[in-house]
Amino acid sequence: MPADSGDRVSRRTALAGISALFLAGCERLGFLAANAPAVFGSYKRYANIPYGPEPQQRLDVYMPERAAVEPRPVVVFWHGGRWREGDKADYRFVGAALAESGYVTVVANYRHYPQVKMPGFMQDAARAALFAAAHAHEYGGARERLYLMGHSAGAHLAALLTLDPRYLAAAGQAAPHIAGVIGLSGPYDFLPLLEPDDQDMFGPPPLYPESQPINFVRADAPPMLLVQGLNDETVKPKNSRNLAAALQALGVPVTLKLYPKVSHADTVAALTALLRGRAPTLADIRAFVGRSSE
């Protein structure tokens, strides 16, 4: 499948208005606008690769334009949307930012509620991660340097997939080595479930604890970077604080970054070129991958 390459042209026109959309709270429009500069980036993209038979089981691979001397880290990213909505096409700016940082990046779709309930989207996450590990070498990546990353609901997928080994084991392949987890504004400790659709999605009630990453912390978990905005009204900062504390109590290396005056969307929006001044998300990701890859 041929790749499309971003052109090195002026980004000024494409970037105009993105910041205003986010500041106005138009997050959906902001994410769409954030992809405008990504079109002009220095990377290769392989789009709509199937990792399963369902229409939503598709992923895009982004890789640096320049060849590497040695295999690169591989980052698998899942979008947010309360497990109900979202699409990888909205997050081209994430793939571009990470590829331009030197990582082979996989941006994966997954089935949403109500098409599936728990554990349906976890099964999709497992399949995407296994696909990324199995095919990393085809894109210049190292399967032993695999990072799982997500924003909001996607961060929940990344954390639970890493901490609860049942999902990767059930996929029928040898579980890959996970070098680290990068969670942006993730829900990790969100009981009780108050909304009827949440209760249905994660139910029945005896199964509610199965949805909580914090209930599966273990001493052999890989290093984690947990990023949270202190102005997040969608996923409270206690989620990242509590998971970090539980992991640290077991001796797991955790980097907790709490950004003042940063919202739920800001942590991921800061990966697009114009908005990188809003939060140091990309710099913290680069530092984390650099440390944990040594």
Feature map (PLM): residue ranges:
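N-terminal secretory signal peptides
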Residues: 1-9, 16-24
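Short beta-strand element of the alpha/beta-hydrolase
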Residues: 71-80
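Catalytic nucleophile-loop/oxyanion-hole region of alpha/beta-hydrolase
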Residues: 86-94, 106-143, 275-276
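Short beta-strand/loop motif that positions the catalytic acidic residue
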Residues: 226-228, 232
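C-terminal catalytic histidine-bearing segment of alpha/beta-hydrolase fold enzymes
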Residues: 249-294
